[in-house]
Amino acid sequence: MGPEQLQRFKLPTIMHIARDLTVMESLRSLRCPAYVLAHKTSVTELGPVIDANIAAIHDKGRRLLSCLTDGMTADQWLYAYCRQEGIHTHDPFRISVTQRNFLHLSGWLVDEGQVALHHDLCVSRYSKV
């Protein structure tokens, strides 16, 4: 398989969760004898990998939602999530990745109607629906 073909089948990273879930589901229709995954392992059945990835996204969403107390700001919610998950880093890169993932997951929860976003004098606050 050439570079052009590989690029066509490249999976998205956690940037837009609803789209990522749709793309993962669409991969079920591929009929290849084997698949090379991101970490250079190969599998012959893609279904279990797709199921595990979808389950992991939903699990992260549930864990993030469990940390939300109505009226929290994004910073408060992220802080509560990091405490719950035991994320104790001072590395700027890891912090930025955690913040990015939080923004995508919290945005997905808002889009899915599980969380409401309220704006009050330039401060955004979240609450469970």
Where do the language-model regions lie?
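Metallo-beta-lactamase
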Residues: 1-61
